Amino acid sequence: TILAKNCSCTYKGVKINIVDTPGHADFGGEVERVLKMVNGVLLLVDAAEGCMPQTRFVLQKALQQNLSLVVAINKIDRPDARIKEVIDEVLYLLMDLGATDEQLDCPMLFCCGRDGTASLDPDVPGTDLVPLFDTLLSTIKPPEGDPEAPFQMLVSSVDYNDFVGRIGIGRIQNGVAKVGEE
């Protein structure tokens, strides 16, 4: 990922916005811009490869902003998965980056993205993504803002679509966007 990508889904009546950020320090400006748009971080770590150098950079920025953290150890189905070692790698990295006790006590899930499953226990295979979404809802605080205040939005990127026209992508700070507003 060079530029952040975003999507959203609705789970239990809550809209969850997901932003995939570049992981490399060379794209630090993009990472910092994106982290201003989110309330928490889902750190995805490969069960075989473990923490990558770019993991350190993005995680450090997220911890500095005191964002809520959920760790997902992915690809646990790989024959070369090192789940317990990767858990230790993540914890050592968090400690090395000066994580608070609350950040160190973050929930960890064990996932197989290919199969669309997540589990809270590495020894119990997941059957769906319900544990992941439930954990996101219980761990990451909803955005703060006043829906009655005038509309304010922190625009992080601008795009263009032939059908819709100019599109501003960002985080609503206050107010509500209404259809037909300019």
Predicted feature locations:
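Structural and coupling elements of P-loop NTPases
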Residues: 1-182
